[in-house]
């Protein structure tokens, strides 16, 4: 499928697969509880774990992130350019839905400059949820055909290429810089 078709599927609260910096991600509209529930069911992922949001700019995160709790140094870190993709755990707004934050008072966000992510966010007007496109026990998909093998020939997949990163993103706490997952 092309970008416009995938954007339409996202607007219709479908779960889609799209390329990111290292692997294909599964994503949906983060403001749609029904879409997020479909995603969690598909991945057999407990809601308590929370989800990552990706977008090309901070503006897409404004509905979810409590920027008043982020100081200038932390904001600079959040906007920094790094050797590897970096996901940051940041304070969430009290209005951010539980189905995104899980059991936490924070949310995971990643500024992503991958052209596919940038285009989908700009076409839809929202950030995307992002979890690796793979079934439990299977390796993450790096090409569109692998997504179709795992999720079926009719699964909505943006047929573009992943970036050059070798590993999924590093995950760090923005306030403490604590490393949760090595990238």
UniProtKB/Swiss-Prot annotation:
<dbReference type="GO" id="GO:0003725">
    <property type="term" value="F:double-stranded RNA binding"/>
</dbReference>
<keyword id="KW-0548">Nucleotidyltransferase</keyword>
<keyword id="KW-0819">tRNA processing</keyword>
<comment type="function">
    <text>Required for the formation of a threonylcarbamoyl group on adenosine at position 37 (t(6)A37) in tRNAs that read codons beginning with adenine. Catalyzes the conversion of L-threonine, HCO(3)(-)/CO(2) and ATP to give threonylcarbamoyl-AMP (TC-AMP) as the acyladenylate intermediate, with the release of diphosphate.</text>
</comment>
<dbReference type="GO" id="GO:0005524">
    <property type="term" value="F:ATP binding"/>
</dbReference>
<dbReference type="GO" id="GO:0002949">
    <property type="term" value="P:tRNA threonylcarbamoyladenosine modification"/>
</dbReference>
<dbReference type="Pfam" id="PF01300">
    <property type="entry name" value="Sua5_yciO_yrdC"/>
</dbReference>
<dbReference type="GO" id="GO:0061710">
    <property type="term" value="F:L-threonylcarbamoyladenylate synthase"/>
</dbReference>
<dbReference type="InterPro" id="IPR050156">
    <property type="entry name" value="TC-AMP_synthase_SUA5"/>
</dbReference>
<dbReference type="GO" id="GO:0006450">
    <property type="term" value="P:regulation of translational fidelity"/>
</dbReference>
<dbReference type="GO" id="GO:0000049">
    <property type="term" value="F:tRNA binding"/>
</dbReference>
<dbReference type="InterPro" id="IPR006070">
    <property type="entry name" value="Sua5-like_dom"/>
</dbReference>
<dbReference type="GO" id="GO:0005737">
    <property type="term" value="C:cytoplasm"/>
</dbReference>
<keyword id="KW-0067">ATP-binding</keyword>
<protein>
    <recommendedName>
        <fullName>Threonylcarbamoyl-AMP synthase</fullName>
        <ecNumber>2.7.7.87</ecNumber>
    </recommendedName>
</protein>
<keyword id="KW-0963">Cytoplasm</keyword>
<feature type="domain" description="YrdC-like">
    <location>
        <begin position="1"/>
        <end position="183"/>
    </location>
</feature>
<keyword id="KW-0808">Transferase</keyword>
<keyword id="KW-0547">Nucleotide-binding</keyword>
<comment type="similarity">
    <text>Belongs to the SUA5 family. TsaC subfamily.</text>
</comment>
<dbReference type="InterPro" id="IPR023535">
    <property type="entry name" value="TC-AMP_synthase"/>
</dbReference>
<dbReference type="InterPro" id="IPR017945">
    <property type="entry name" value="DHBP_synth_RibB-like_a/b_dom"/>
</dbReference>
């Amino acid at each position: 499928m092309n970008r416009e078709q995938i954007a339409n599927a996202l607007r219709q609260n479908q779960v889609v697969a799209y390329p990111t910096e290292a692997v294909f991600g599964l994503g949906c509209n983060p403001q749609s509880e029904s879409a997020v529930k479909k995603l969690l069911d598909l991945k057999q992922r407990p809601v308590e774990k929370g989800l990552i949001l990706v977008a090309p700019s901070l503006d897409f995160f404004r509905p979810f992130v409590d920027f008043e709790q982020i100081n200038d140094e932390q904001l600079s870190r959040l906007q920094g350019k790094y050797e590897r993709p970096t996901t940051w755990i940041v304070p969430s707004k009290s209005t951010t839905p539980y189905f995104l934050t899980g059991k936490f008072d924070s949310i995971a966000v990643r500024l992503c400059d991958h052209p596919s992510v940038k285009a989908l966010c700009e076409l839809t007007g929202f950030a995307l949820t992002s979890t690796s496109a793979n079934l439990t026990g299977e390796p993450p998909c790096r090409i569109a055909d692998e997504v179709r093998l795992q999720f079926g020939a009719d699964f909505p997949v943006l047929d573009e290429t992943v970036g050059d990163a070798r590993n999924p993103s590093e995950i760090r706490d923005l306030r403490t810089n604590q490393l949760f997952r090595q990238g």
